[in-house]
Amino acid sequence: SDSIGKFLPDKDRPDEGVFSFKDETKWLSLRYDLTAPLARYVAKNYLEIPKPFKRYQLGTVWRNEKPGPGRYREFLQFDADYVGTKNLQADAELCVLISEILEKCGLNKIDYIVKISSRKFTDKLFEQLKIKSKDQISIILRALDKIDRLGWSEAQKLLEKGREDKSGDFTKGANLKKDQVKIIENALKNKNPNSEDVLEIIKIFESYNFKNYKFDPSVIRGLEYYTGPIFEVNLNFDVKNLKGQPIQFGSIGGGGRYDNLVSNFGNLDCPATGISIGLDRLVFALMQKKDFRIKATRPVVICIFDKSKMKE
């Protein structure tokens, strides 16, 4: 459980969202993402790896969360990261990379959008709200991260006393006052980039002639280890559930800068940034496009017991 980033157990057990069990005196957990294990690897092999260290990985991860259309408790995740550089060109390149991946999958530029924001935006927001409690900040971040899936009215309940879903499960809220919630709502309506890191990334996008992005302060990303620019990829076409009903699908990928995560596993100053895509989630959405087809190929093994039949 010591390699799951945000979910480092600082109480009696890891936080919700992780499949965990106790083995004598310590907690063991299924891999929640591919980023935190990378940070642990970098910390243990810091002197041996080149800087910046670039890597990509495919791997299975598990989420102890309520499943839904395109949302699974076990799924395949693609991850790409830059480790050991503060240069924001790395962040911009990862946004372009995720764009190229989607277009290789058959999507057109009109089918998706890369949204960018910065964790510095929420840092200023918490200062304005005069909120310092890490637990309360964590609840607020998770609530804001659900806006694209639940909508503002339902996310607002999570900012206040809490929310009961259709199954009757109740999620405790952040207990914010009405005026605090209003401050957040107004801040999310601001569409002008107001942080230096976002402005610099936009300049790099322009030099790449990359236009498939927009600034969106509602992009939060629920994980606490993000420290700077954050990005998210949303689809622009309708996605339906198994009953054929249109749904708010949310993002199919995203990421951001996590300059302090490696230091959780060693006394190192090692900036990093990365992106990830939920492949099962992406395929669920792609299968609903009328013009999308998966080219399925598979090996065929033929056992021959008579050498004289080889030519046949």
PLM segments and residue spans:
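Short internal beta-strands
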Residues: 113-117, 301-304
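Short glycine/threonine-rich loop-to-helix capping motif typified by GTGT followed
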Residues: 10, 123-133, 225-231, 288
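Positively charged, Gly/Ser-enriched RNA/tRNA-binding surfaces
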Residues: 3-4, 23-25, 34-47, 55-108, ...
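Glycine-rich loop at the start of a catalytic domain that most often binds anionic cofactors/ligands
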Residues: 4-20
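Internal, well-ordered alpha-helical segments in soluble enzyme and binding-protein domains
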Residues: 94, 118-121, 140-143, 180, ...
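A charged helix-plus-loop insertion that forms the helical arch/lid used to bind
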Residues: 133-144, 155-159
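Short, conserved secondary-structure transition motifs
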Residues: 115-129, 144-152
